[in-house]
UniProtKB/Swiss-Prot annotation:
Taxonomy of the source species: Eukaryota, Viridiplantae, Streptophyta, Embryophyta, Tracheophyta
Annotated Low complexity bias: 1-16
InterPro entries from the UniProt entry: ALOG (IPR040222), ALOG_dom (IPR006936)
Family of this protein: Belongs to the plant homeotic and developmental regulators ALOG protein family.
Record's subcellular location: Nucleus
Main subcellular localisation: nucleus
Region of interest: Disordered: 1-22, 138-168
Protein source organism: Arabidopsis thaliana
Name of the molecule in the record: Protein LIGHT-DEPENDENT SHORT HYPOCOTYLS 5
Length: 182
C-alpha cells in the first residue's frame, strides 16, 4: 500500500513540476535564447562568467527596482519624497535567486565539471556582491555583513585520575576555566 502511494506521488510530481522547477526551466530557456541571439551566437560549451555578467546586465532593462545614482538628490534615502529619473534595474535578490537556479540547471544537464559552471564563476559572485552593496547604499540601507561574535569559550582540561568514573573515587575530572579575550 505504501509503495503505491509513493509511486503515485512520484508520478504526480513528475507530471507537474514544482514551481521552482518550472521557474528554473523558464530561466534556463531564457538564457539559451540569449545565447542564440548573442552577436555572434554562443554555444553553451563556450559560455564563460563574462557572458553570464552580460546576461545579468541585459536583464536590467526589464527590472522594476529603482536604483538611485550617486548624483541623484534621493541617493541614500529609503523613502524619497518624489520621482526621479534614475534607472530601474533588477533587484539583487532576484539576480541572486536566478543565478542559483541557473547554476543548478547547468549541473543537471551535465554541463561538465563544477569548476566549468559559468554561473559559479568568481566574477559572477563578485558582481552580485557589488550589486547588493550598491543597491543597499542607494536605498539608504547599507548592507553590513554581521560579524560573528566570538562566543565566550570555556576550555576543558582533564585532570589525571585512576580512570574510574565512580563518585568520590578520584576518577578523571574536567576542570573548566573561562578563557578571557582581550
Amino acid at each position: 500500500m505504501e509503495g503505491e502511494t509513493a509511486a503515485k506521488a512520484a508520478a504526480s510530481s513528475s507530471s507537474s513540476p514544482s514551481r521552482y522547477e518550472s521557474q528554473k526551466r523558464r530561466d534556463w530557456n531564457t538564457f539559451l535564447q540569449y545565447l542564440r541571439n548573442h552577436k555572434p551566437p554562443l554555444n553553451l560549451s563556450r559560455c564563460s562568467g563574462a557572458h553570464v555578467l552580460e546576461f545579468l546586465k541585459y536583464l536590467d532593462q526589464f527590472g522594476k527596482t529603482k536604483v538611485h545614482a550617486t548624483a541623484c538628490p534621493f541617493f541614500g534615502q529609503p523613502n524619497p519624497p518624489s520621482q526621479c529619473t534614475c534607472p530601474l534595474k533588477q533587484a539583487w535578490g532576484s539576480l541572486d535567486a536566478l543565478i542559483g537556479r541557473l547554476r543548478a540547471a547547468f549541473e543537471e544537464i551535465g554541463g561538465g565539471l563544477p569548476e566549468s559552471n559559468p554561473f559559479a564563476a568568481k566574477a559572477v559572485r563578485i558582481y552580485l556582491k557589488e550589486v547588493r552593496q550598491t543597491q543597499a547604499k542607494a536605498r539608504g540601507i547599507p548592507y553590513d555583513k554581521k560579524k560573528r561574535k566570538r562566543p565566550h569559550t570555556d576550555t576543558a582540561t582533564p585532570i589525571a585520575g585512576d580512570g574510574d568514573d565512580a563518585e568520590g573515587s578520584g576518577g578523571a575530572a574536567l576542570v573548566v576555566t573561562a578563557a578571557t579575550t582581550v
